[in-house]
UniProtKB/Swiss-Prot annotation:
Binds multiple chlorophylls. PSII binds additional chlorophylls, carotenoids and specific lipids. One of its GO terms (biological process) is photosynthetic electron transport in photosystem II. The gene is psbB. It is found in: Plastid, Chloroplast thylakoid membrane. It comes from Dioscorea elephantipes. Belongs to the PsbB/PsbC family. PsbB subfamily. This is Photosystem II CP47 reaction center protein. One of its GO terms (molecular function) is chlorophyll binding.
């Protein structure tokens, strides 16, 4: 049936058995990809340093999703939070991957069975003997079952009543772990950063889905509505399904890019807005201030800053710094972080503390400018040395490190001072290993960036798909030239416009 590539799906348009078959095969492909991708990631994942080389630095995509749902252990004897374990149980990373692959195989066999045995009694209308589907009834069944799954996830899995709970962390991504969640039924449940809202919203939405499903199973649509929305046409189902999918894709693109309780920074990396707002920098300075108030020395106060917190405050972990067409993990860009060198404090010869102005997200290069506590420029690395007034040499800038590997070390030679001033533009300074992976030094995005870009792009495409198929089903008679209420037998090919005797073709 020489169909063009963009019309091949019409072969299942009036064939319920094979329509079911291709959907089962699609599920097999999705599940098989998920399981295979998980096994591939587990083969290349290095769990040895969860602080400086976490999953998101290594470009892991499916491991974070398993982890946020409560999977933390591997049959390889390691745990995502570091350390070793002896009894990971069946629901380890490998167990979940294997379950997806087994499920994929079963779906594959089911798809073949339904393709071969397509002409089943269940698909036949007993009044006409022709294949047909009761689409409003099927909608009710699907709504009921998805509501049941939604309710079960919120009431049992997330709450820990029968399940592990989900990944929960503090606002700075330092203390994350899998734990059970109490539903948040107050106004706080609408805060996207409150995990309790995940439980309560799934319970509420699931309950609504169950009730709506039962409603659609027990109440038939009015005839006018049935005809108006073309409820008997399978393309109506396609159009509304695409709408549900693109809406969900837009929502998750937003929750991923802007951050939420469902996308913890320990699993997906920080958001770009945390760099833009100096989010981690402010917390670090607050902690240092608390240490100084407790009569600790500057060195002791900085030494108490967790390496994990300092690492978040580094521009290389900003997902917006990676170019769209730079493939590979963050580790393939600026390298594998080995250790925090410490916090550099710059001073001029008059003893004033100077702060390096940080590079904004969308700059590749940025002038090195050092300002005092009042924001007045006191030193820089000039573009034209002949006209410079504030060069490091002229101002006599020195640098001393507090905390980290260089704790207590100071430099006064201008070359070294300028080197660390340039690196301080990028946030906290880390030693990076670029040799192991042959990293090229060009920043990459985190899985947060890839997920957002992918889902926003497909959401846009699916939006147009919804408009396209919605228009086709609503205006089918206009496009086809056939009145859907036409009862008379029409001879295809006899008229230029089907069923219109005024356009009878002339014999040649």
């Amino acid at each position: 049936m020489g169909l063009p590539w963009y019309r091949v799906h019409t072969v299942v348009l009036n064939d319920p058995g094979r329509l079911l078959s291709v959907h089962i095969m699609h599920t097999a492909l999705v599940s098989g990809w998920a399981g295979s991708m998980a096994l591939y990631e587990l083969a290349v994942f290095d769990p040895s340093d969860p602080v400086l080389d976490p999953m998101w630095r290594q470009g892991m995509f499916v491991i974070p999703f398993m982890t946020r749902l409560g999977i933390t252990n591997s049959w390889g004897g390691w745990s995502i939070s570091g350390g070793s374990i002896t009894n990971p149980g069946i629901w380890s990373y490998e167990g979940v991957a294997g379950a997806h692959i087994v499920f994929s195989g079963l779906c594959f066999l089911a798809a073949i069975w339904h393709w071969v045995y397509w002409d089943l009694e269940i698909f036949c209308d007993e009044r006409t003997g022709k294949p047909s589907l009761d689409l409003p009834k099927i909608f009710g069944i699907h709504l009921f079952l998805s509501g049941l799954a939604c309710f079960g996830f919120g009431a049992f899995h997330v709450t820990g009543l029968y399940g592990p709970g989900i990944w929960v962390s503090d606002p700075y991504g330092l203390t994350g772990k899998v734990q059970s969640i109490n539903p948040a039924w107050g106004v706080e449940g609408f805060d996207p950063f409150v995990p309790g809202g995940i439980a309560s919203h799934h319970i509420a939405a699931g309950t609504l889905g169950i009730l709506a499903g039962l409603f659609h199973l027990s109440v038939r649509p009015p005839q006018r509505l049935y005809k108006g929305l073309r409820m008997g046409n399978i393309e109506t189902v396609l159009s509304s399904s695409i709408a549900a999918v693109f809406f969900a894709a837009f929502v998750v693109a937003g929750t991923m890019w802007y951050g939420s309780a469902t996308t913890p920074i320990e699993l997906f990396g920080p958001t770009r807005y945390q760099w833009d707002q100096g989010y981690f920098q402010q917390e670090i300075y607050r902690r240092v201030g608390v240490g100084l108030a407790e009569n600790l020395s500057l060195s002791e106060a900085w030494s108490k800053i967790p390496e994990k917190l300092a690492f978040y405050d580094y521009i290389g972990n900003n997902p917006a710094k990676g170019g769209l067409f730079r493939a590979g993990s963050m580790d393939n860009g600026d390298g594998i972080a080995v250790g925090w060198l410490g916090h550099p404090i710059f001073r001029d010869k008059e003893g004033r503390e100077l702060f390096v102005r940080r590079m904004p997200t969308f700059f590749e290069t940025f002038p090195v400018v050092l300002v005092d506590v009042d924001g007045i420029v006191r030193a820089d690395v000039p573009f034209r040395r002949a006209e410079s007034k504030y060069s490091v040499e002229q101002v006599g800038v020195t640098v001393e490190f507090y905390g980290g590997e260089l704790n207590g070390v100071s430099y006064s030679d201008p070359t070294t001072v300028k080197k660390y001033a340039r690196r301080a533009q990028l946030g906290e300074i880390f030693e990076l290993d670029r040799a192991t992976l042959k990293s090229d030094g060009v920043f990459r995005s985190s899985p947060r960036g890839w997920f957002t870009f992918g889902h926003a792009s497909f959401a846009l495409l699916f939006f147009f798909g919804h408009i396209w198929h919605g228009a086709r089903t609503l205006f089918r008679d206009v496009f086809a030239g056939i009145d859907p209420d036409l009862d008379a037998q029409v001879e295809f090919g006899a008229f230029q416009k089907i069923g219109d005797p005024t356009t009878r073709r002339q014999a040649v």
